[in-house]
């Protein structure tokens, strides 16, 4: 078999060499080949071009121009001229017009343009007419291996999990060779790692893989790989290398360990359950997202006393009490804690020795408030009992001092004023309780810590006390609702008037039975239905409205409680007129049906009369006091309250009070003593020497009044012991040239001097003041 295979390979090689030789021979003289292939036969052929494409190698090293090929027709003419048309004519190619030879006038690069499409034209030199139809042809540029591979990026970034298995793909890089991939190995690329080959390898496809499983992010987080690309002939250049940066992805492959072996905390005993009392810190080389530390208490008797929660933000362990701390019970807690990571497979890794630590928690004493023995109290009490012991609450001081405790009921409690609590915590009711009024009472009892003197220390606790009032059969049955029965005056025997039912304010059991009895003899019959209802029917029939319009039926209702209670409820039955169909046509008004009692009417009238008498007494008392004050005033006091209405200005200043004793003394000539003042000394104006009186026939004028005022003013100004007199009033002069003249009562010397006012004395005591004011001649009584 081996010999057969070798024979076949040798035969194939020989055939290949023969084919290459044939191609070379054909290409050595293409023009000649074309010419021979297109020689005319015995029959006449149409003239036509004898070529279709040309070939040339890129980047020839010979001098320009480079001969590409030759264009010619099957029929030669001496006056023929060859032309080229196309985009690259004159720039890249030209043609010899006489011979048809095509030349490249610049070096060609296949990587830029691999084919050129031109048009060949043959024309007559003289006329310029086309001798042949223009023909398009192609010039193909043959590739040579003149380019080296170039990476698509100079820098690649990749990542791979740490501790990955050997052969794990990291990244694929690509380098591109611009040469023709169809020609030999011109475009084939080969890769190799120049830097980082200790940890990574690359295959010919550009895929980089790991060759070791000892990649540890905690030791080295990044790796730099330099990759080289070259073609099959070994062409390399500056662009033939690239850098790959490989970042190791962290995995949770490290156990946490404590930063110290012993933690000590001091915690007050009043620390609330669930609050932090301390924190435990560990180190974990992994990245934060892979730090999943779990803390647990290993040894000790206090596993149920504390819990350790993990704070994800800082990976710390927060110690929290699970039940209240009590210094009087335990002063110190000591236990061992362990920090582990449950996501790490313990089959491949074992935790380090530093993942355990000792925790010591010292409890400090705090003055705590009293503690009740129960979270709440529930007591029961029968209603209508007179101040029995309801129950006892008890609180104790949890501290070692064991202070005494005082109790009180908060006044904000529900009806707390009905109860009291003693120093021992006994609760009593202050009044009888009625379940039908309040079936439940909710009290808040305070327990206050007292010092040796009995003064509260400020520490207090409260507890809720629920008092349930138990029912007794202390209420008689009554109608279930108000009834307003009616009956026709022509009602017949046995006619149903009303069905009644009863209720009881007490708690009624399911077997409660009410018994109904009609207690009086009348025209009605009561029939007990034995289902807690009863029927009222007409006994004889035919009522007389003229005699009785309303009938009162006292119904006695009793229950079967222990003891039994009996009550009487009255039905007010109105006798109405009815038509033939038995429909009510006229009944008495509601007031008559209800039948307001005489006692109620008398009570209402007495209330109205009492209110009226009280109102009259108040009015008369105020009036008598007003009259007493009016009659008890002296003449100067009356003068002090007189208001003059002929002043044209001043507003309310006209009613300013002033001491009129001075004017009175002037008017009386000093004979009448002035009104006593608080000061024993007489008024300043009473001490002033008065001007001499005028003759009886003389008349005082404004000038004399002004002179007197000036004298008084000077004396007041020079009197250092007297109070200032800042307000001066002139009443005798009210202006000049007034048509109505003066209306003032003080200026009557010129208007009513001849009027006799003695008749005022005959008008009685009500005009006594006017008689004193006007009963004498003003010119003799007053001095202006």
UniProtKB/Swiss-Prot annotation:
Name of the protein in question: Cadherin-5
Ligand binding (Ca(2+) 3): 145, 147, 177, 179, 186, 231
Organism: Homo sapiens
Posttranslational mods: Phosphorylated on tyrosine residues by KDR/VEGFR-2. Dephosphorylated by PTPRB.
InterPro entries: Cadherin (IPR039808), Cadherin-like_dom (IPR002126), Cadherin-like_sf (IPR015919), Cadherin_CS (IPR020894), Cadherin_Y-type_LIR (IPR000233), Catenin-bd_sf (IPR027397)
Residues the entry annotates as binding Ca(2+) 1: 58-59, 109, 111, 146
Residues that bind Ca(2+) 2: 58, 111, 143-144, 146, 179
Segments for region (Required for interaction with PALS1): 621-660
Tissue: Expressed in endothelial cells (at protein level). Expressed in the brain.
Residues exposed to the Extracellular side: 48-599
Gene3D superfamilies with a match to the protein in the record: Cadherins (2.60.40.60), TCF3-CBD (Catenin binding domain) (4.10.900.10)
Positions annotated as propeptide: 26-47
Membrane topology: Single-pass type I membrane protein
One Gene Ontology molecular-function label: signaling receptor complex adaptor activity
Gene: CDH5
